[in-house]
């Protein structure tokens, strides 16, 4: 059986989240609470929040998505920067994706954020660069849609909901995670852009 660091990340996240569900002190220590970063210098929260989730549905949605697409991205990245490089990509995505949120709410004692969505979005959008015509099943759409169509819908919806607000979802982290996934991949291997456009224009080509 081939070793999968994606599966290790999923397992660690599930274990930490499960523990935090039953340990309020752990949840409070890892959650992104901006004043704790700003005043207490608890910078680990910028990463730690990505390993805890609000509930089982939140956790399962993120981890199923990560497991579904992480393996393919891991294998490609491993050829370029090794397995540690892929791990660094995922962990740094969690941090980068939350930074705009932290800066916006740095003095807001009532704001909290948690979840792996920033890192998961980065992995998903890196995958879309590699295979834009891959079919994705997205609730509540009843039929599979091409990955690049999903990407457009995802970005548009996230921008709209970020401006609208009121649903207790950190859409900013989704957007910045997606942007980081694309930028990191293209900086790592600029030829991916050519591959993406060729695949987009010639879906049946090799």
Predicted regions and their residues:
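A detector for small-residue-rich transmembrane helices and their helix-helix packing motifs
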Residues: 1-206
């Amino acid at each position: 059986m081939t070793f999968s660091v994606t599966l290790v990340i999923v397992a660690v996240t599930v274990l930490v989240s499960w523990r935090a569900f039953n340990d309020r002190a752990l949840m409070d220590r890892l959650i992104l609470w901006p004043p704790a970063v700003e005043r207490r210098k608890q910078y680990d929260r910028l990463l730690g929040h990505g390993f805890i989730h609000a509930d089982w549905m939140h956790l399962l949605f993120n981890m199923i998505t990560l497991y579904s697409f992480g393996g393919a991205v891991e294998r490609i990245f491993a050829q370029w920067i090794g397995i540690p490089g892929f791990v660094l990509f995922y962990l740094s995505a969690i941090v980068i994706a939350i930074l705009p949120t932290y800066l916006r709410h740095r003095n807001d004692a009532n704001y909290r954020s948690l979840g792996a969505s920033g890192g998961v979005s980065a992995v998903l959008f890196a995958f879309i660069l590699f295979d834009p015509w891959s079919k994705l099943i997205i609730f509540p759409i009843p039929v599979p849609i091409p990955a690049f169509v999903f990407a457009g819908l995802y970005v548009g919806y996230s921008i709209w909901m970020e401006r609208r607000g009121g649903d207790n979802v950190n859409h900013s982290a989704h957007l910045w995670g997606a942007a980081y996934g694309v930028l990191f991949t293209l900086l790592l291997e600029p030829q991916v852009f050519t591959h993406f456009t060729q695949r987009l224009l010639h879906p049946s080509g090799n």
